[in-house]
A protein has these predicted regions:
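Catalytic metal-binding/acid-base residues of hydrolase active sites
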Residues: 59
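Structured mid-to-C-terminal alpha-helical surface segments
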Residues: 1-52, 62-74, 78-295
Length: 295
């Protein structure tokens, strides 16, 4: 740590985050949450290594720094029980990593992140130099199956000015990440109502641009996630988004530089997933550069 005085570090941190926000055209709140989340996850990795994996929108943020939508929470899948997770989070929050951050964390209710063993939500306040820096939400689930070895992700190096190394975390494999998004996007709720989560379509489009995917691995991940969660069948095609998604989808798409029309997002997502969910064995490899499947 370059700064011995917490107040000096906070002043330098605020200046760095303001510069980052201006350069990237993103709200300052995005950068603040990113830093606070990664410092908390660095503590959790120290307190409970190999006990948890990151999932959801924040995992996507680490896969494509500066390009993913702003997320208000972090989703974590724990390997044992919710009580163990709660204990580990409290212990992690109490760790002093010499970075002038301090955390206060408490359980605030239940959370649904698709884990078989249920989930709970935690609220954390991050402090720097004795003053509130950012408030965070952490959703923790248990009972989720890892379909393949997790990916190792590195947080953006926003604290290099203070000689603080970026956090390293494990996240669910990209194919499983996509499969869980497909499940959430196609799940119906209550009185057979479609999902209201426009963010899932945004995330699917962004992930389709990340890599060259093997058809069999992606198909297997989707089938296994749907079997594990047992809420509905794998669709034969990706359904179109509801009409009332127009406004929320536009806001999210404009934040990440996508076409603001939900129909355009659906066309891209359907090109990526329709052949996979239909089990079209003529498709073998997804080419992200051309947005098409090749034999």
């Amino acid at each position: 740590m370059k700064y011995a005085a917490p107040a000096a570090f906070r002043a330098a941190l605020e200046a760095r985050l303001n510069a980052t926000a201006r350069a990237g055209g993103r709200p300052i709140g995005h950068a603040r949450k990113l830093v606070a989340f990664t410092r908390l996850l660095a503590r959790l990795e120290r307190a409970a290594p190999d006990r948890w994996v990151l999932k959801g929108g924040f995992a996507l943020e680490l896969r494509v720094p500066g390009q993913a939508r702003t997320t208000r929470d972090v989703d974590i899948d724990w390997d044992t029980s919710l009580d163990d997770a709660a204990t580990a989070l409290v212990e992690a929050a109490a760790l002093d990593l010499g970075d002038h951050f301090a955390f206060d964390i408490r359980r605030v209710g239940d959370a649904d992140i698709g884990s078989a063993g249920g989930g709970v939500r935690f609220h954390a306040d991050a402090y720097v130099a004795g003053r509130l820096f950012e408030s965070l939400l952490i959703d923790v689930g248990v009972g989720g199956e890892l379909l393949s070895p997790p990916d190792e992700l590195t947080a953006p190096d926003l604290l290099d000015f203070a000689e603080i190394a970026p956090a390293h975390v494990r996240a669910i494999a990209l194919e499983q990440h996509i499969a869980e998004k497909v499940h959430a996007y196609t799940r119906r709720h209550g009185d057979d109502q479609p999902s209201s989560r426009a963010k899932d379509l945004i995330d699917i489009v962004l992930m389709s641009e990340l890599a060259s995917f093997d058809f069999d691995r992606l198909r297997e991940a989707i089938v296994r996630v749907f079997e594990e969660r047992a809420t509905h069948e794998v669709p034969t095609a990706l359904p179109a988004p509801p009409l009332d998604w127009a406004r929320p989808y536009r806001a999210l798409a404009e934040e990440v530089g996508l076409d603001p029309n939900p129909a355009a997002g659906h066309r891209l997502a359907a090109a990526f997933l329709d052949r996979v969910v239909a089990g079209d064995t003529d498709a073998r490899q997804w080419d992200a550069s051309t947005a098409e499947w090749r034999r």
